[in-house]
Every structure is written in structure tokens, then in C-alpha cells.
Amino acid sequence: MVYADYHVHSDYSDDSWYLMEDVVKDAIQLGLKEICFTDHVDYGVKPDWKPREEFQVGKNKEVKNVHYDLYFAELDKLAKKYEKEINIKKGLEFGMQVHTIPKFEELYQSQDFDFILLSVHQIEDKEFWTGEFQKGHTHKESYDRYYDEMYQLVTTYKNYSVLAHMDLVRRYLDKEVDRFEYNKDKIKEILKVVIENNKGIEVNTSSSRYEINGLTPSIEILKLYHELGGKIITIGSD
């Protein structure tokens, strides 16, 4: 068995202080044989770094996308430095919305990626974690809008590897009770498209860190994925 983590964030993500080389060293210490860096890009709510703006590793915490030049340069350097101890893959987490698809496709074509996570973090440029997306809507309405957006994404965009933390929005709605039945039919349609396109889904272990009652995605989603013939699953600590 090969122990791997395919959802890893470093200091290049605005919500992490974890230096990239420290991630690698800790992964080796834990016995992992493969990791994939998947730092955040969220077009629509975050700008890119401009050429004259200075990014300082370990210091900058501006709400922006990955500093691509520095990120890919350090990733390549560490992959060579530690190649005898661990396999380091090049990826990103695309926090995608339907209206940002063209920007992400441009980014995808700019690099030779090993792995891309497709995530839904915002809808109509409204964040989940701030509560802006949910404001003025019932839980049912929020779930409906979330899975509708996800369905549009997976039926439109194909240059990704795995659909990340599929029921992420639950983290911001109800950690105790899983509302799988609200959107079972829509989830089924999403999974069918994922499978037909030879993509996968992720088991995201951050559910324990966020004290969610159950797995992410839920055991019901995982069972349905298996029943539909899904075979590709990655594990990520996020």
C-alpha cells in the first residue's frame, strides 16, 4: 500500500502558514510516499498577484490566489531535492464557479499539471465561510443552489482530476445532521457525470478537524458512488 495525500496546502494559500518544505519534511516523517500540493485559486473572489507586488514566504497573508511563479518554482525545486524520499506532484485546487471557467482553463493550459482538484467554494462570488452565500436562504435552498452549480461545472468543465469534498457546504450549514436526502437525485446525476468522464471524488479527512458528524463526503454519497460504478477515490487532508 502506498500512503499518499492528494489535498495539501502550503503558505502559498492565503489560509495556510505551512511552509512548503515543512510540509514535505513532515510528510516524509509520517511515512507518506507521495503528496500533491493543491494550493488555492478562487477566481471571482481573489485576484492574482501583480508583477510588481512582492510575495514574502511566511509573511504575506493577503487574500489572493497562488503566486504562480514562486509556487511552481519551489515545488519543482523540492521535488528534485527530495525525489529519493517522496514523490511530489504538481497540482492546484480550482475553486470554480460557472462564470470563472474561462479563467481556469487559461490557467490550466499554462502548466503541465499532475492533478487538479475541482471545488465549489463560492457561488455568484459569495463565500460560504463568511455566511454571505447562505444569507436570506433556507438550508434547503442553499443545498439546492450548491449542487446545481456543481452539476453545471462537471457537465461543462473536463480538465480536472477529482471532485473535492463534495458536500463541503454542509460545513457551513449543519455539521450534526447530514441532509443527503435533500439532493439525492441531483447528487446521483453529478456522480454519473463524474464517472462517465473518468474522473474521481475525494475523501477529505478535514471532517474530523472541523468536527463534522460523519465523513466528507458523507457515507451515503460514498455508497452511491460505489453503487454507480465509481472507482477513483483520492484521500486528502486539506
Question: Model-derived features: where do they sit?
Answer:
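An N-terminally biased module of ancient metal coordination in phosphate/nucleic-acid-related enzymes
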Residues: M1-V98, L107, Y172-D174, R179-E181, ...
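Residues at alpha-helix caps and immediate loop-helix transition turns in enzyme cores, especially N-
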Residues: S16-L19, T100-K103, G214-S218
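A short helix->loop->beta-strand "cap" motif at the edges of active sites that frequently abuts
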Residues: L32, K84-I86, N197-K199, G230-K231
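Short acidic/histidine-rich active-site segments
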Residues: H40, M166, G230-D238
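Domain-core and long-helix interface of multi-subunit machines
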Residues: F94, S110-L228
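A short acidic, amphipathic alpha-helical/loop segment
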Residues: K103-F104, L224
